[in-house]
């Protein structure tokens, strides 16, 4: 309600189309996975609001590896704690002003951590076919 008349802000509640998502200069979200897709494809930053995390594996800390969706937030944008919510506008403005820095940073990150960019479907399909062929061969040898 607060921003309904602000023409510079669009709040999306209908997710049947994602075209406008990728036109945005900045995404503000909580833990949504769309943040990574958005950042990787647009090289634009994400402002995360640090709401309580939905934990699928309550034992994750025993593994000793910080989950990807926690540490990656700091690589593709900024994180605001709930008690810092009043800093959202200022933080967003600073992030938009630094868009070139974020573009370079996200681009480097994608090159380092995203494999088979642009051909992952083909690579994945070939891998699955190879594994099926190996399983068939093992089955025939038994």
What are these regions (language model features)?
Residues 15-16, 83-84, 119:
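Short beta->alpha linker loops
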Residues 117-142:
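C-terminal alpha-helical cap of glycosyltransferases
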Residues 4, 33-113:
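Catalytic binding pocket for nucleotide-activated donors in carbohydrate/polymer assembly enzymes
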Residues 1-36, 41:
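Donor nucleotide-activated moiety binding/catalytic core segment of transferases
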Residues 19, 86-87, 123:
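An acidic, carboxylate-rich microenvironment
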Residues 13-24, 50-58, 139-142:
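Hydrophobic transmembrane alpha-helix bundles
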């Amino acid at each position: 309600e607060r921003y309904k008349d602000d023409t510079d802000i669009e709040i999306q509640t209908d997710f049947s189309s994602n075209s406008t998502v990728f036109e945005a200069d900045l995404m503000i979200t909580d833990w949504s996975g769309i943040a990574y897709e958005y950042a990787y494809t647009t090289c634009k930053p994400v402002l995360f609001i640090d709401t309580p995390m939905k934990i699928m594996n309550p034992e994750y800390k025993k593994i000793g590896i910080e989950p990807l969706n926690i540490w990656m937030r700091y690589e593709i944008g900024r994180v605001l704690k709930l008690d810092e919510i009043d800093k959202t506008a200022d933080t967003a403005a600073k992030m938009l002003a630094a868009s070139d820095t974020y573009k370079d940073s996200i681009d480097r990150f994608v090159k380092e951590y995203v494999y088979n960019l642009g051909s992952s479907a083909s690579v994945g399909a070939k891998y699955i076919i190879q594994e099926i062929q190996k399983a068939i061969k093992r089955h025939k040898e038994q």
